[in-house]
């Protein structure tokens, strides 16, 4: 499970960690790992808080922090699921677009640009912003889908992005 984005409170890393803890406590889902990918851009106090939360929940073996990735397609390529947990509306919501363009299922908060780029339950899933239980339930729903359903969601997501953001529409 990948959460890309710079480390700042409104990108939702805290709720993501709380969600991973809720998922980890369950015994009815397959084992998983989570990656928080993004630079703290000098916000080391916030990163220390996040690392403390990971330690408090004993998730050190489950959640990995990666500061940067020069090749984001590679990061998306290793993910089975991408999350965008913003607690404040983003004008565009690049993570949702990038995940869909890579054919990876996306679970995103129901505010901002993601609501316009995701076709709900067809190219991705939306959860109530700031609600770790809603995010947990959305991730469980994705984890319980079969391989063909996930491939279909990924394929529909890619088609959606190619249709909405082709060169002619973006440059003319």
Name every feature range the model reports, one short phrase each:
Residues 1-11, 17-20, 35:
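Conserved donor-binding/catalytic core segment of Leloir-type glycosyltransferases
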Residues 4, 33-48:
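Glycosyltransferase donor-sugar binding loop
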Residues 42-47, 59-69, 75, 125-126:
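Active-site donor-binding acidic/aromatic loop of nucleotide-activated sugar
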Residues 65-79, 101, 119:
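Short acidic alpha-helix that forms the nucleotide-activated donor recognition element
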Residues 77-91, 104:
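Acidic donor-binding loop of glycosyltransferase active sites
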Residues 105-108, 118:
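Short hydrophobic beta-strand element within catalytic cores of glycosyltransferases
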Residues 120-121, 125-132, 141-147:
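Conserved acidic donor-binding segment of nucleotide-sugar-dependent glycosyltransferases
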Residues 141, 149-164:
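A short, well-ordered alpha-helix in the C-terminal region of glycosyltransferases
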